[in-house]
Amino acid sequence: MSLIDTRIPEPKRFISGATGDWEVVIGMEVHAQVTSESKLFSGASTSFGAEPNSNVSLVDAAMPGMLPVINLECVKQAVRTGIGLNAQINLKSVFDRKNYFYPDLPQGYQISQFKQPIVGEGKIMISVGPDNKGQFEDVEIGIERLHLEQDAGKSMHDQHPTMSYVDLNRSGVALMEIVSKPDLRSSDEARAYLTKLRTIVRYLGTCDGNMDEGSMRADVNVSVRRPGGEFGTRCEIKNVNSIRFVGQAIEYEARRQIAILEDGGSIDQETRLFDPVKGETRSMRSKEEAHDYRYFPDPDLLPLEFDQAFVDALAVDLPELPDVKKQRLVEKQGISIYDASILVTEKAIADYYESVAAGRDGKAAANWVINDLLGALNKAGKDIEESPVSPEQLGAVIDLIKEGTISGKIAKDLFEIVWNEGGDPKKLVEERGMKQVTDTGAIEKAVDDVIAANPEKVEQAKAKPTLAGWFVGQVMKATGGKANPQSVNELVKAKLGIEE
C-alpha cells in the first residue's frame, strides 16, 4: 500500500484525545472471491458448503508434478472489476510465489501477483452521511491495485480435543485482492467504502459479496497521527467479515493507539484480530514486510498477456453500474439523490423498483419500495429476492390509490394482506369491501357527526384553523379509512367556515 497523503485534514473527522485532536488513517485490502465455477489454476469446483476436502484437485493438494493452468474466466472477471473501478488495466501481468508456511497452504507458497498486477490504479466515489442536516458528502477514494491470487485452505481447531484438521476445499479458489490507498479517515468512510465496493462487484457479477460465507473479507490497516502530521505506525486487522465489524474494529483500534501514544508509548507494527463478542482487537503476530515472503516470478506460469481488444470486448458487455444508475433514476424518475442511493445499493432492489415504477409516478413507487417494502423485508429478515410481494402486486396497489379506489391508509392494510396472504390486490379490494367511500352524502354525514360530538373543538378550530386536521383524522377513523381524504378535508373546512 503506497503512503501518499491525498486528503486535506478535516476537523469533523478528528478524534478528541486527552492531549488534543488525532486523525485516523485507514487503508483496506479486500479479498473478494471471484465468481467462477472452477478454481484459479485447477478444474475443481468452487461450490460453498461442500463436504470437507471434496472439492480438491491434485493441483490444489500440491501433488508433485502437477502444474497450474490459468482459468480464463477468472482473468475476465478481474478485468471486468478493474473497469468497474475506473482503473488502469495492465495488458501484461506476472504471477509470483509468496513464500510462507502454514498447514492449510499445501504448496508452501501462495500464487499471487506482486510487482506487476493485472489491474493498476483506479478510484471509486463513496457517499458519507447523512449529517445532522440530512446532507451526504461525496468522497473520492483511490484504488492502488487489484491482483489475482489463490485462497488458502481452512484450519479447523474445534473438531478434536488434541488435533487440528485441514479442509482444502477453499485452497486454490480465485481471489481478487483490491487494495485501497490510505485515503479513508473515519469508520463511517470505511463502512461506506466497503459497502460501495461490494455493490460494484455484485452489479458486475464478479463476486457475490457474501461476507458471512467468507467470499468477501477485509484486512483493515489503521494508524493515527496528529492532524496533518506524518503517517503513524499502522496495525493490520485481519479477516474482518462484516461491514459493521469493520466500523467497530476501526473505532476500537484508533482509541487503543491514541491511548498508548498519549501515555508516552509507541505503536508496534503488528497483525491483529477483531473479537466481535468483546468488541476489541487483540495481537496476533508481528506484521510481516514484503521481503519476508521472498516473492519471485512463478516459473510454472508464463506472464499473463492480452491486448486492448480483449479489454474493450469485456467493457462493452458490462451492466449499468450503481453511480450511473443513480443519476439516471434521479433524472428520469424525479426522485431524490437520497432515495436513489438507497435503491441502487443492491442491483436486485434497483431492478424491483424499476419494475414497479414503469409507467407510474417514480416518487410514489420509491416511497412504497423504500418505506413499506424494504421496511417489511428488514423486519422479517428477508432479502429482496424473498419478497412475498411481487413488483406487479405492489404496482397494482399504487394504481388503486391513483385511481381513487382506495385511500392511502387502506393501501397500507392492503399491502399487509398481500404480504401475508398473497393474491391480486384489485380482487382483494372487491372481495373485502375495501373500496374508498366517494359518496358525498355518506362522507358529509360522518363529518356532521364528528362536528356535533365535539363542540369545544369547533370553537377552537375557528380560532386555530390548523385544528381542521384533527377533524379530518376523526372522520377517517370513523369511516375505517375508507373516506376520500380530499373530500373529507374540503367538507370539514366548509363546515367549520375555514377558508383555504
Swiss-Prot record:
SUPFAM superfamilies: GatB/YqeY motif, Glutamine synthetase/guanido kinase. PROSITE patterns: GATB (PS01234). It comes from the Bacteria. Its EC number is 6.3.5.-. One of its GO terms (biological process) is translation. Keywords: ATP-binding, Ligase, Nucleotide-binding, Protein biosynthesis. It holds the Pfam family GatB_Yqey. Coiled coil: none annotated. Allows the formation of correctly charged Asn-tRNA(Asn) or Gln-tRNA(Gln) through the transamidation of misacylated Asp-tRNA(Asn) or Glu-tRNA(Gln) in organisms which lack either or both of asparaginyl-tRNA or glutaminyl-tRNA synthetases. The reaction takes place in the presence of glutamine and ATP through an activated phospho-Asp-tRNA(Asn) or phospho-Glu-tRNA(Gln). Heterotrimer of A, B and C subunits. This is Aspartyl/glutamyl-tRNA(Asn/Gln) amidotransferase subunit B. It comes from Brucella anthropi (strain ATCC 49188 / DSM 6882 / CCUG 24695 / JCM 21032 / LMG 3331 / NBRC 15819 / NCTC 12168 / Alc 37).
